[in-house]
Each structure stands twice: as structure tokens, then as C-alpha cells.
């Protein structure tokens, strides 16, 4: 085997390993957050410390990589990146973290998978295009799967999950709106620059949000936590946020975005496994059927999009 071929094999193997580790780390996010909640942290505090710890690390990544500015960039693009960051890194996670306080990590991960459903709806409205029968069937199948995942006809279980589900579905909708309206910014200014500016804006928005809540008398404990809690905050910021970004970035460089997306689809399955192993969470049979249905339909939609090279 020639040296060039061996080099390509090593690159592909390294890229796959990077992506697998990144997916494993990112999939554990809900588990660490759940542990923080069990130790007494509030959703606002978890998100605030995640932002404060992640922002300088994203700027460090920016300085290390020093990505060149893409051609044709406009001055307003950086401001758009900040605006996009408020939605993608502040509002969407805030709704998700609040919702996760009311549902299991398993259910939360499946609900977050619904974002392609919102992307589909927003794109159809934007482009004013009629959907195909196949797409409409997929939408109805996902909606029915989500209904089952929340408890289906078990009224008590369904009601217990409803509050959290509303927040998490809103989080998915906000993220989908970001993808439809601002997804092109990744190509215009680059993913590293978008994350640095966006996360900075999100951190500022989070501090403003907590300040407004404090002024309104809705104080959330932000300090006086035990040392172990700050360790959890650091893990959430570094292990489940920054490290996955770097590993996926390096993995995509080596094996391409399509193969990377295929590997990352294992994330929801890993979260469900973590929830059962580390949190002792369990799903009823109806919920398992619903989660499985949502996973396979959404995965099928994403695979078809990857195969056809379709972009929103």
C-alpha cells in the first residue's frame, strides 16, 4: 500500500474517532444538567455558567485556528452573527434547560429531534411551496410519535410531561428558525467565527436576562454552590459544549460533512442509553414506540436530505 493511501486511511480513521468522541460528549449534556438540577442548581444558573465558561474557550479556539475571512463578507454579517447567537445559544438553550427540569433526559432528547419538522414547516412557508405527500406523511408520523413519547393515552403521564414538552418544542422551533433565517451565516463568516461572536452575544443576553429577573424580584441563586457544583458547570461548558465543537470540526475536515452528520445521528440513542444507565430513567412501552418512531422518521428525513444534497 502506498504511503499516500495509508495517510488517507489514517486521516479517515482519525476523523471518525474525533466525531465518535464528540458525539459521545455532546450526547451526555442532558445527563450532566440533570445531575446539576438534582444537586440544587436552577436552569438559569446552569446556562449562565455554561456561557461564562465557554465564551473565553471559543475565543481561544478562534485565536488558535485564525480562520480567514470568507470573500464577499459584509460588515453587517458580524452583527447578524451576534443576533443569531442570541437565538441559537441563548433563547433556544434557555427554553431547553427549563423544559429539561420537567421531563426525563430521554424524552428531552427525542423532543429536540423534532427541529427538522419546524425547519420543514418554516421553509415551506418561506418558499410558498406545497409539500409532497411523502413529506406530509413524515410530519404526521413524527407528530404522532411525539404524542406517544410524551405518554400517549396515559393522561397522567402525558400531563406530567406537558409543561416540559412545551418549552423543549419551543426550543426546537427557535433553533429551526435560526437555521432557516441565519444558517447561511456559517458559509459567509465561517463556523468558528460564528460560534465566537454568537456565544459572546448569548452570554451578554444571559447576563441581561438574569439582571432583569433580579430587578423584578425573581432572584435565582447564582453563587454559594458547593465546589462540586462548579465542577459540573465546568463539565457542561467544556466537555459537552466546547470539546464536541472542536472534535466535530476536526472530524469534518477529515471525512466530510455528510459522513459526520451520519455519525452524529447516533446521539439520541446514546442519550437514551445514558439516561437509563446513569439516571435510572425508564420509558413505558408506548413511549418506546413513540421515541423509536420519531428517531427513525427524522433520521430518514435527514438521510434523504444528505443523499440529495438538499439545503434549507
Curated annotation (Swiss-Prot):
Residue ranges crossing the lipid bilayer per the database entry: 13-33, 45-65, 81-101, 105-125, 133-153, 162-182, 198-218, 229-249, 260-280, 283-303
Alphabetically ordered keywords of this record: Cell membrane, Membrane, Transmembrane, Transmembrane helix, Transport
Membrane topology: Multi-pass membrane protein
GO cellular component, one term: plasma membrane
Domain of life: Bacteria
InterPro entries for this protein: Diverse_Substrate_Transporter, EamA_dom
Every EamA domain range: 173-303
Subcellular location: Cell membrane
SUPFAM superfamilies (alphabetical): Multidrug resistance efflux transporter EmrE
UniProt-listed PANTHER family: EAMA DOMAIN-CONTAINING PROTEIN, OS03G0707200 PROTEIN-RELATED
UniProt similarity note: Belongs to the EamA transporter family.
Record protein name field: Uncharacterized transporter YcbK
Source organism per UniProt: Bacillus subtilis (strain 168)
Amino acid at each position: 500500500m502506498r504511503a499516500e493511501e495509508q495517510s488517507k486511511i489514517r486521516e479517515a480513521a482519525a476523523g471518525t474517532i474525533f466525531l465518535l468522541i464528540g458525539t459521545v460528549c455532546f450526547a451526555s449534556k442532558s445527563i450532566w444538567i440533570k445531575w446539576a438540577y438534582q444537586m440544587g442548581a436552577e436552569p438559569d444558573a446552569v446556562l449562565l455558567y455554561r456561557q461564562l465558561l465557554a465564551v473565553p474557550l471559543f475565543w481561544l479556539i478562534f485565536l488558535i485556528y485564525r480562520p480567514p475571512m470568507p470573500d464577499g463578507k459584509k460588515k453587517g454579517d458580524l452583527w447578524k452573527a451576534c443576533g443569531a447567537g442570541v437565538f441559537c445559544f441563548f433563547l433556544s438553550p434557555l427554553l431547553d434547560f427549563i423544559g429539561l427540569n420537567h421531563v426525563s433526559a430521554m424524552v428531552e432528547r427525542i423532543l429536540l429531534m423534532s427541529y427538522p419538522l419546524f425547519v420543514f414547516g418554516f421553509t415551506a412557508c418561506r418558499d410558498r411551496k406545497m409539500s409532497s405527500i411523502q413529506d406530509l406523511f413524515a410530519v404526521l408520523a413524527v407528530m404522532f410519535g411525539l404524542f406517544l413519547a410524551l405518554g400517549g393515552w396515559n393522561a397522567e403521564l402525558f400531563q406530567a410531561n406537558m409543561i416540559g414538552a412545551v418549552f423543549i418544542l419551543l426550543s426546537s422551533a427557535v433553533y429551526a428558525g435560526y437555521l432557516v433565517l441565519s444558517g447561511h451565516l456559517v458559509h459567509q463568516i465561517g463556523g468558528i467565527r460564528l460560534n465566537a461572536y454568537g456565544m459572546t452575544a448569548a452570554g451578554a443576553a444571559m447576563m441581561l436576562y438574569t439582571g432583569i429577573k433580579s430587578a423584578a424580584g425573581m432572584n435565582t441563586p447564582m453563587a454559594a454552590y458547593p465546589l462540586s457544583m462548579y465542577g459540573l458547570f465546568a463539565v457542561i461548558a467544556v466537555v459537552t459544549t466546547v470539546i464536541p465543537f472542536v472534535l466535530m470540526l476536526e472530524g469534518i475536515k477529515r471525512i466530510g460533512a455528510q459522513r459526520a452528520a451520519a455519525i452524529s445521528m447516533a446521539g439520541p440513542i446514546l442519550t437514551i442509553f445514558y439516561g437509563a444507565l446513569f439516571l435510572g430513567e425508564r420509558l413505558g412501552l408506548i413511549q418506546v414506540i413513540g421515541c423509536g418512531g420519531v428517531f427513525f422518521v427524522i433520521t430518514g428525513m435527514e438521510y434523504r436530505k444528505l443523499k440529495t444534497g438538499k439545503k434549507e
